Amino acid sequence: GTELDMSKDPGAGPHALPYRWRPMTWKYEGKPFVHERTTATQQTGFSFVAQARNWLPNPIGGIFWFGVDDAASTVYFPAYCGITSVPEAYAEGKGDMLTYCSDCAFWTFNKVSNFSYLRYDVMHAEVAKVQNELETRFISNTQLIDNTAKELYQNDPKKALQYLTDYSANTGNYVVNRWEKMFQFLLVKFMDGNVKQEENGVFKYNKYNLCPDHVNNPQLPDWWKKIIIDATGDKLVQPEPKK
């Protein structure tokens, strides 16, 4: 990174969190300071990428790639502009800012993002891996969906709209279900500050098949250790063993 990399200064903490919580402006010894804001922010309600293809019929040519919560950890799914209803998990009335909803997009994505902020350096890598996998799949499916919808549209526009509605709804709901599994995976793997061993999403048990195999505990970076030592002096120094 560069000197502008917000994951590298002490404000990021030992786990390289690029975000800075409010207040963004603050003072020290009477001098004003400001935290910079990342391109993707934690308080994002929703974001989208609008794709317009004028060579296709209007209901097919427009795609609203839609995602909720933090843009850096959301998954954008394709909502064709000709759909007649939205995925249930994204529908109005599914919880609100003060009412938790276990099967709606907003709260499911917030569970994952807010948990990953605790150990961003290791958790966000897991999030990004599945995020890229899903979005790559949706993008690669686009031409097939376009062609099928176009063929239906030529004969019966209503069938084409229903096809697109079903596809967008199923895709959006699938994303939320997959993200709930993402949260469960993160909780199991990173619970209590440990990192459990797994391979392709399958956790490893010890030889007794009762407890996890040996857990990993990544070291804190040296610069963070120095901050602790500078603040505590000799308080945390281990005494020499008695001979």
Stretch-by-stretch model annotation:
Residues 1-243:
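C-terminus-biased signal that marks the final domain/tail of proteins
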